[in-house]
């Protein structure tokens, strides 16, 4: 309700709200996309890896996002043209600007982050290909949109998504990742929109 009152002319779409058919909203030039609880299984399992996601979508592209981790008080936020940041609510004077990791150094290995819910043969095959090409590969399993936040802060190099996903699960972190200098691509390495 507060976001709607702050920006009354911008529609709001949430995973938890009534469904708005794509045929109606595809003409929206700008809207808020919210996932009030990303990582439901992580929330149920009380592992701390669930988030609140808010994205601003313009012309079909995530241009700004906020990913908040309630358990730790850490927020990731950013947008196109303003950069990306990480901040702990308990240390408001200690913002950290996010920049994706630089090109991997030879023999440094690849840091792969993956969903603990979607590990399997496809991921194993990809990890093997990466190891054959780059050498060492380190796999970190994590829940929710935190995986893309690790990319944005430079703590991981790649996040292969092998299972279906919904726009509210990725939009906020996508905006942050792009603001930090990263990108999400499809299997043909085209930027995802």
Residue ranges, per PLM feature:
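N-terminal subdomain of lithium-sensitive/metallo-dependent phosphomonoesterases centered on the IMPase/IPPase/PAP
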Residues: 1-37, 125-128, 132
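Acidic beta-strand-loop-alpha-helix segment within the catalytic core
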Residues: 54-148, 192-193
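Oxyanion/phosphate-interacting regions
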Residues: 125-133, 140, 146-193
């Amino acid at each position: 309700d507060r976001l709607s009152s702050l920006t009354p002319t911008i529609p709001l779409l949430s995973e938890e709200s009534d469904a708005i058919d794509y045929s109606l909203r595809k003409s929206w030039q700008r809207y808020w996309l919210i996932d009030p609880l990303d990582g439901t299984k992580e929330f149920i399992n009380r592992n701390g890896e669930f988030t609140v996601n808010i994205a601003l979508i313009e012309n079909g592209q995530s241009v700004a996002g906020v990913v908040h981790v309630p358990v730790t008080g850490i927020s990731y936020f950013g947008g196109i043209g303003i950069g990306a940041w990480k901040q702990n609510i308990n240390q408001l004077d200690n913002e950290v600007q996010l920049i994706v990791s630089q090109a991997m150094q030879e023999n440094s290995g690849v840091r792969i982050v993956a969903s603990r819910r979607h590990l399997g043969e496809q991921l194993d095959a990809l990890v093997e290909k990466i190891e054959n090409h780059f050498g060492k590969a380190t796999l970190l399993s994590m829940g929710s949109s935190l995986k893309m936040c690790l990319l944005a802060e430079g703590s991981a190099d790649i996040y292969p998504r092998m299972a279906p996903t919904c726009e509210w699960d990725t939009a906020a972190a996508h905006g942050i990742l792009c603001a930090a200098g990263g990108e999400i691509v499809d299997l043909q390495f085209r930027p995802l929109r």
